[in-house]
Amino acid sequence: MVPGTGGGRDCLTLVVATALTQLLWLPGCCGSHIVGGHEVKPHARPYMASVNFEGHHHCGGFLFHAHWVLSAAHCFSDRDPSTGLVVLGAHALLTPEPTQQVFGIAAVVSHPDFEPTTQANDICLLRLNGSAVLGPAVRLLRLPRRGAKPPVAGTRCRVSGWGSVSDFEEPPPGLMEVEVRILDLSVCNSSWQGQLSPAMLCTHSGDRRRRGFCSADSGGPLVCGNRAHGLVSFSGLWCGDPKTPDVYTQVSAFVSWIWDVVRASPTPGSMGCSLRAV
């Protein structure tokens, strides 16, 4: 705006816009992306799952059992699971691939103590309406062992996703990934003004560069030592900003609950999968 023009109306607009930019991105919102990462080799992360609504990628997740995907509970806060699909074996979501397996969602089991306002216990299980066919492009990712402690500060981990690769919602060419480091939870909690719970994990870039995730990558795994130690939960306004470190659900805190849910649930039939043709 040119100085001296527009009057009070433009001034008010500027004030409102400035105030809005101070808000956090809500998890699952648009315009989010892996920051400072790179495209992985096709199917190098065969455990990755895309949760899809109305033909569009909505959240991530990962396959830990032939019938089950782990994701973030907030991804389903305002969604009807019966209208969603889970895509396995994908690299480029916008391109038909013979490796892709597509399932309906038979059930969503969110943690009973999930708190949407604080994102505490932000974890859910998706029961597929069929059994994944395991192979080179579709494989399981291991959970932490029961009673395992979270990775120590400084541990190098990786996080993957299909979120957009620019602030203009540009879709990625394929699955993106970035390397991050575990940040001490007490240090992270100070940055978040004491809002975090003990069952969370934080990461940062380890240097001054912006690296990390944004909310369209929600539900995707934080992989440390070939096990899923975190689930993407929330971040600040500026993705990868060290002032507001990326926050994950700490998977090791929920391993017993996860397997209790799996054991208590019926096994679906094996005919729910459709293989995408070229």
Swiss-Prot record:
Signal peptide from the UniProt entry: 1-31
SMART domains according to UniProt: Tryp_SPc
Keywords: Disulfide bond, Glycoprotein, Heparin-binding, Hydrolase, Protease, Secreted, Serine protease, Signal
Chief localisation class: cytoplasm
Glycosylation sites: 129
Pfam families in UniProt: Trypsin
GO molecular function (one): serine-type peptidase activity
Residue intervals of the Peptidase S1 domain: 34-263
Modifications made to the protein after synthesis: After cleavage of the signal peptide, the N-terminus is probably further processed by CTSC. Processing by CTSC is probably required for accumulation in cytoplasmic granules; in the absence of CTSC the protein does not accumulate. N-glycosylated.
Subcellular location: Cytoplasmic granule lumen; Secreted
S-S pairs: 59-75, 157-224, 188-202, 214-239
EC number(s) stated in the UniProt entry for this protein: 3.4.21.-
GO terms classed as biological process: protein maturation; proteolysis
Gene3D superfamilies: Trypsin-like serine proteases
Classification via InterPro entries: Peptidase_S1_PA, Peptidase_S1_PA_chymotrypsin, Peptidase_S1A, Trypsin_dom, TRYPSIN_HIS
Active-site annotation: 74, 122, 218
GO cellular component, one term: extracellular space
Known role: Serine protease that cleaves preferentially after Arg residues. Can also cleave after citrulline (deimidated arginine) and methylarginine residues.
Family: Belongs to the peptidase S1 family.
PANTHER family per record: KALLIKREIN-RELATED (PTHR24271), SERINE PROTEASE 57 (PTHR24271:SF55)
Protein name, per record: Serine protease 57
Species classification: Eukaryota, Metazoa, Chordata, Craniata, Vertebrata
Gene: Prss57
